[in-house]
Amino acid sequence: MSENLTGRIIKQISGYYDIAVNGTTYRTRGRGSLRNDKITPLVGDFAAFQPGEGDDEGYLLKVLPRHNALVRPPVANVDQAVLITSAVEPDFSKNLLDRFLVYLEGHDIHAEIYLTKTDLTKPQRLTKIRQDLAGYTKIGYPVFAPDKPFDPTILAQVQASFADKLTIFTGQTGAGKSTLLNHLVPGLD
């Protein structure tokens, strides 16, 4: 019987949990005791588990205490969020941006702001949006507002900001989350 290990859940599907430890991924199933104790493991959870032998999956034994947890998406122990907001289609909204930031701060999640669709708005409107975003920079939020869409220099700064951190990408529907992710990680499914 193998020794128990501790790692982070990186994927959950149909009762299976993939747990990463030092670059190795182990497939596990939750023990019945988790269900009996009404514990639902989430992606991002740190967990104790018993690795499987050969091709057999192991067993997730215990979910360790969480720093934070979100319902949508269901994820735990989030270090930071990249909050995507668009200049247009949908229109920029300080009110909505504030609501997202309050939600993230309430869950002790560091936020960074990324402005998309800067090429689709009028220059005067973009100037006003950038003035609004400067206020967020003044209170400590990193803001990425590229002049041209998906500027490689800005993308490199965003990538550097989430190295070695569990980062979620969030924002209103249509703001460009998937498009940004596909530019950050080409070939992402």
Please tell me what each predicted stretch does.
Residues 91, 121, 187:
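Catalytic P-loop NTPase motifs of RecA-like helicase/translocase cores
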Residues 120-175:
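Canonical P-loop GTPase G-domain recognition
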Residues 178-189:
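A conserved segment at the C-terminal end of the G1
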Residues 1-94:
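N-terminal accessory targeting/assembly segments
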Residues 78-85, 107-118, 140-145:
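Conserved beta-strand/loop subsegment of P-loop NTPase cores
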Residues 3, 11-13, 107, 137-139, ...:
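Short flexible coil/turn linkers enriched for glycine and charged/polar residues
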Residues 95-110:
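Histidine-anchored nucleotide/phosphate-binding helix
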Residues 44, 104, 116:
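Residue-level signal for inorganic ion chemistry
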